[in-house]
């Protein structure tokens, strides 16, 4: 689960950048 956190954080950052 911990290994997924960086991936999720990157996805959120990408979405924030897109918006």
Swiss-Prot record:
The keyword Transcription regulation does not apply. Keywords: Amidation, Amphibian defense peptide, Antibiotic, Antimicrobial, Cytolysis, Fungicide, Hemolysis, Immunity, Innate immunity, Secreted. The modification Leucine amide is found at residue 19. Phylloseptin-2.1TR is amidated, whereas Phylloseptin-2.2TR is the name given to the non-amidated form. This is Phylloseptin-2.1TR. One of its GO terms (biological process) is defense response to fungus. GO terms for cellular component: extracellular region.
